[in-house]
Amino acid sequence: EKDVEAECSFRVSGKQPQLWNPVTGETRYLTSFTDNGTVTTLKLLFDTTQSYFIVFAGKTDHRTGEPNFSDKADLMTLGGSWNVSFNPLWGGPDSVEFKELSDWSLSEVEGIRYYSGTAVYNKLFDLSEPVNGRVYLNLGNVKNIAKVTLNGHDLGTVWSAPWEIEITDALTSGENKLRIEVANLWVNRLIGDEQLPDDGIVGEQWPQWLINGEKRPSSRYTFTTYKHYSA
């Protein structure tokens, strides 16, 4: 998966192009483009599955010829181990060490493989010297939503490609404390519960333990009124 550069032409003339990012809310002027009196042409850089709104408005006062997108360079890779905390109330193993980032559903630990909910990833990393320019954290492939906190600063939530978030203002020289809260889908727990005795709805009969407000007899964690899956 690589960035894609595209030369895009729009049937508009005499207007200043702007880029509106629907994921981050960023809006900015595009400074490099040509206008032949009928069509405006400019180059756009897209990450995987990324999209923009291009808006034309006002006079072309911001055409400087500077590239519309800055060059990217990898600053560091946050490899190695992570401390990950799950919620034991939902079958998780509390705090564990991941030697490397991995897919929960492939774990040999049932409490992780079938976990559904939020897990918290914590990691310390060092930055030897200040960085010039803007810095972004790329999370890779997230399943399915992540909230990022760096050095106590809530940086927001990432929920779609390109799975990155700006960390410039929260990043410091020396030690940095990164916290990422990741939430997945319900299906993991549904699949795990399906391995246990069924104490749910039978036909049209609701379970007596639910009607009476009693503790359920099985070790299932969830309850659904409709089985919309095969497991």
Language-model features: locations:
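Carbohydrate-binding surfaces of carbohydrate-active enzymes
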Residues: 1-118, 126-133, 167
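Short, surface-exposed tryptophan/glycine-enriched loops
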Residues: 126, 165-175, 186
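Aromatic-lined ligand-binding clefts that engage carbohydrates, nucleic acids, or primary amines
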Residues: 9, 125-151, 158-159, 178-182
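An acidic-aromatic loop/edge-strand motif
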Residues: 62-117, 173-231
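A generic beta-sheet turn/junction motif
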Residues: 1, 12, 141-143, 171-173
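Aromatic-rich membrane-interfacial microdomains
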Residues: 155-165
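Extended, loop-rich substrate-binding clefts of extracytoplasmic carbohydrate-active enzymes
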Residues: 121
